Amino acid sequence: MILPSGIVNHYNHLMIVMKFGGSSVANAERIKHVASIIQAYQDKRPVVVLSAMGDTTDHLLEAADKAVESVVDVGGVAKLHEETAGELGIKIDTIQALLVELKQLLTGISMLKEVSKRSRDYLVSFGERMSVRMMAAYLESQGIPAKFYDAWDIGIKSDSNFMAAELLDEVWDNIPHHLNAYKNGQDNEIPIVTGFIAKDIKGNITTLGRGGSDLTATMIGAAMRAEEVQTWKDVDGIMTTDPRVVKDAKPVPEVTYEEAQELAIFGAQVLHPRSMLPVRKVGTPVRVKNSYNIKSPGTVIVEKHTGKVPPVCAITTVKHITLIDIVSSRMLGAAG
């Protein structure tokens, strides 16, 4: 992605981007909790990026498998969202419309007896699309102005590499065009945006592959020159090591983009390296926060360390690796 020239002057006010994964919005109780977090940051003018609820993606793929066998069934997906909406006390007209659309797609799959990559991306998108509608409706019911957006509504476009699409360069200009009014205070409805999905230039829905929801969040944050991008998880940031293995593991206050990338490559639960690309271009900080410990500062990922650099920031491990050390006199003086 190439950073366009001439867009720097659009950013006179600060804002943040808040990304919540599927486990954070898995049920009504968690949705209420996330809503309370959003409300706590309301004065920061947050843009919220959401994944699909809990196991919705798995339910959608199971529905596709059934459709190939001529069984059209949206029951699992419908039950989860209808029951959750009932517990939240919200109307779900927009979700019902999506369920009708989903049933039509599954009917088409049942006729073709196959799921193409394009159809799979279209299918999977229903999870994120229902999730943002649910959250926006609940926030509104609590007196918090909010509006849901499918990613393409704010100009998030991609190529046509289904299941692993790449964002187009025009996204850098598209996002500010749609969100500047909110950032500058002319619009007060909190944008609730689908993560993970986009549309290509033909209007086909695509998915962004691994780390796709994080990529959506960092792309919005970078394009809008946000104060920071927050990704909310169930730990107090990036830990010194795996807390499941070492009970005394502690959160690391600060790491660089490069350190975060290395940790992610070797298995640490950090942002996918691909999702760091937009923020690295403009230096937008990314903060990993704990949704169950809001007061914890978490870990901030920055371009350069702002204080004393620790000799070792964190340790991660990769299991089931075999090291083979070959020693031979014939290798004397050879590289490697």
Residue ranges and their predicted role:
Residues V279:
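Acidic-aromatic/histidine active-site loop/patch
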Residues I90-I95, L271-R274, P285-I294, I326:
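Flexible, glycine/charged-enriched surface loops at secondary-structure junctions
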